[in-house]
């Protein structure tokens, strides 16, 4: 069976690229974020992972959007994007998503990528490839 990945993050329209908390992502624009997300999903699929990608838009209730995506589960690996994880103003969002996902998938592994292009390797920290369902200890 193929390792199933739920990747979630902020839709580019939801990000205020001029806000101080996003200044750490130097040079990031709506187009660059959209392309990075698309490239990340493509790389994961090319590496053999089964990926469901859900992006949280303006006006969305994040937990509801993720719950809807969870209907496509179960998932083995749960990847939450840097815009959620690394921005202090999104701490409650990050906490809520972690608790929601952990309650639904207590045996899944959370994967925090170092960069979009490293996601396949980051998932492989926990799995010995896309066809191995049992996570490494």
Where are these regions (language model features)?
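Short catalytic helix/loop segments, enriched in acidic residues and glycine
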Residues: 23-42
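The AdoMet/dcAdoMet-binding core of the Class I SAM-like
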Residues: 13, 31-35, 116
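Ser/Thr/Gly-rich flexible loops in soluble cytosolic domains mediating phosphotransfer, phosphorylation
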Residues: 36, 93-130
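N-terminal, charge-rich interaction modules
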Residues: 1-23
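Mid-chain, well-packed structural core segment of small domains
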Residues: 64-100
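Acidic/glycine-enriched edge-of-secondary-structure segments
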Residues: 42-61
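Short, glycine-/small-residue-rich phosphate/pyrophosphate-handling segment
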Residues: 24-25, 47, 53, 113-137
């Amino acid at each position: 069976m193929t390792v199933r990945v739920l990747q979630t993050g902020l839709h580019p329209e939801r990000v205020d690229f001029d806000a101080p908390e996003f200044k750490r992502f130097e040079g990031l624009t709506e187009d660059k974020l959209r392309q990075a997300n698309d490239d990340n999903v493509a790389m994961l699929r090319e590496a053999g992972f089964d990926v469901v990608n859900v992006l949280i838009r303006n006006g969305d209730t994040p937990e509801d959007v993720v719950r809807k995506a969870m209907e496509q589960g179960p998932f083995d690996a749960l990847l939450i994007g840097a815009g959620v994880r690394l921005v202090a103003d999104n701490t409650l969002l990050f906490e809520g998503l972690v608790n929601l996902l952990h309650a639904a998938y207590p045996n899944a592994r959370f994967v925090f990528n170092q960069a979009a292009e490293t996601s396949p390797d980051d998932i492989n920290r926990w799995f010995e490839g896309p066809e191995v369902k049992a996570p490494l200890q």
